[in-house]
């Protein structure tokens, strides 16, 4: 939490802080051997290991899609549809959402989409702050609804059934969440279309704009939507993610190679002892997040095994008389976690999950409903916080772009408080659902 508030969303430091926290915790424990044994149990937690393996596969899958120029294909489509200004801003939201829906990676979407959509959007007359908000919102849409996203996986697998073994099924949770997502999704498109245009004049000439747009187009990139559609369809129908994702990788590789979008060397190559390509790059991009997940899960397991969570649930649930009160408590508690821990939206999801599960079971809430409260709350206001990981990543990409292109405007971190429409609207939709 402290690192988030000082804009130090560095994964290595967060991992180090977690390890230091575990060491400090040992000082307050009577049986230190048992303490570390419990930590090892937490590190090997089945939920954590399931997420780790899926994330590694997702890392490879998402990198292959980027190598296949999916982004360039989407930009080509927007140009052919004559999208500019507000229309392009709405399209940026849709394209970002499509990419995030395919990969399930919010940060990966921001990192992949910003270098392409942001400069082109500025050229076409988009309001820079609103355009950035559209990219983040699209990323959050995919992270919230994609069957392969870490948010969907963690929020579902952490909510257990009361009367039988197992956790909330991912496919069922996604289907149940759609009725909340659709109103927020449509409202966001309308708002980005209304507020996406800029009143200022463009600072570049038409020739430069035409050259820049032309250099980031490839209609063949749209072919990479084929594996995307297959993965989403299989996952929603209930197929195991360990089956759907490898199928997506195989299809994406085949499509990319046949269409000439990339070669075998783009997937894996060794030059002068240096390994490169989509396969090692995809795994490397997920390693730190996976390690951080394991550390945080082990810390959460300590809270549960110590009896602290049971005592906290007992105190919080004493005055709960009706189901709606439990739903409000779960939703607001998860929201508070998302704001306090904004560096990575998966972390508040993991931290709040045990308490949400305990309170929800006591109030006899279905695991699907609990998972949706958790996923929506943890993918809400943290997206637009000035110290949040999404905003910091977006600004980092924009600043890198602006160093070589004077026409690219760099918004202030606080500008996104009012432009990340989708996650905020979705939070309101869920809040209203609790009321009704």
Predicted segments with their positions:
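Hydrophobic mid-bilayer segments of alpha-helices in multi-pass membrane transport proteins
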Residues: 1, 9-29, 51-58, 90, ...
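Interfacial loop-to-helix junctions that mark the boundaries of transmembrane helices
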Residues: 4-16, 41-45, 79-84, 175-176, ...
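Core transmembrane alpha-helical segments of multi-pass membrane transporters/permeases
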Residues: 11-19, 27, 35-72, 270-310, ...
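Juxtamembrane helix-boundary/capping and inter-helix hinge elements in multi-pass membrane proteins
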Residues: 30-33, 44-48, 125-129, 154-174, ...
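Membrane-interfacial loop-to-helix junctions in multi-pass transporters
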Residues: 45-51, 76-94, 122-131, 217-223, ...
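Hydrophobic alpha-helical transmembrane segments of multi-pass integral membrane proteins
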Residues: 52-61, 83-116, 316-357, 362-363, ...
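Alpha-helical transmembrane segments of multi-pass membrane proteins
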Residues: 86-99, 125-142, 325-338, 365-384, ...
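Juxtamembrane and boundary regions of transmembrane helices in multi-pass small-molecule transporters
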Residues: 137-139, 144-213, 383-436
